[in-house]
Amino acid sequence: VHWTEKERTIITGIFSHMDYEDIGPKALSRCLIVYPWTQRHFSCFGNLYNAEAIMGNANVAAHGIKVLHGLDRGVKNMDNIVATYAELSILHSEKLHVDPDNFKLLSDCITIVVAAKMGHAFTGETQAAFQKFLAVVVSALGKQYH
């Protein structure tokens, strides 16, 4: 993947200003609510009965934060994202048996939450760079499935 300096600046800028404790829980909650079949991977998280329960679930919040910190690893290793996520790809495919399409669904939810938080600053150029980054991460996480 070729990253322009502008893309690198946009992506690192988004993550340097990101409130992980706000964005992470909101993004994962949104994914579990909008795509309820993704909940099957989180049965150990307790009550996921409805939107209110999901949004108030401490385990969902903690995992959402963990996901964003995982993305931060990709930001720090943009020139070697596949290797950065190799272990996570194996874990999600071989042990957790996560449908790789779920990574794309979550990345879409992350984009929506980040866009809502950034408002007018989330320009088309910003969205293009951010979604390119997430697409590369999603592809890397799915490598073990191929």
UniProtKB/Swiss-Prot annotation:
One of its GO terms (cellular component) is hemoglobin complex. InterPro entries: Globin, Globin-like_sf, Globin/Proto, Hemoglobin_b, Hemoglobin_oxygen_transport. GO terms for biological process: hydrogen peroxide catabolic process. The keyword Iron applies. Gene3D superfamilies: Globins (1.10.490.10). Heme b binds at H63, H92. Involved in oxygen transport from gills to the various peripheral tissues. Hb1 is a heterotetramer of two alpha chains and two beta-1 chains. This is Hemoglobin subunit beta-1.
